[in-house]
Amino acid sequence: MSQKDPYKTYRLVSDPFYESPLVTLLIMHVLRNGKKSISQRIVYSAIENIAMKVKEDPLEIIERAIKNVIPAVEIRSRRIGGSTYQVPTEVRVHRGISLSIRWVIKFAKIRPGKSMSLKLANELLDASKNLGNSIRKKEDTHKMAEANRAFAHYRY
């Protein structure tokens, strides 16, 4: 038995401007070198860009985008008897949200363009329409899980 205490989940404080925990998660994942004000500026201007491009509520678009990118299953490597198997496992809710936010930000960074806020806004808009690289990443993950379904009985 492990002697460590169980992982403590902490309550997520909503951001002061939009009062949305999802926006807070976006800000925290964009964060680099502890410069939260810069990441807030990037996310808030991305939300403003979304609001200018689409006449819907930008928070609903962000929520839809993150929901569309959440994977149902993922691949985990499991070493059994000297060989490593790619075992498909279900994704828990919090991990799914975290993965989807990470993928959206990762693929926003590698998009062509100058400002990160524009690239993030475009990636979120594409993800809300089931397009873009983050959706492709989710589909690739699902294909890998389907291909390795034979090893599902090795689940953790």
Swiss-Prot record:
One of its GO terms (cellular component) is chloroplast. Pfam families: Ribosomal_S7. The keyword Ribosomal protein applies. Signal peptide: none annotated. One of its GO terms (molecular function) is rRNA binding. Part of the 30S ribosomal subunit. This is Small ribosomal subunit protein uS7c. It comes from Cyanidium caldarium.
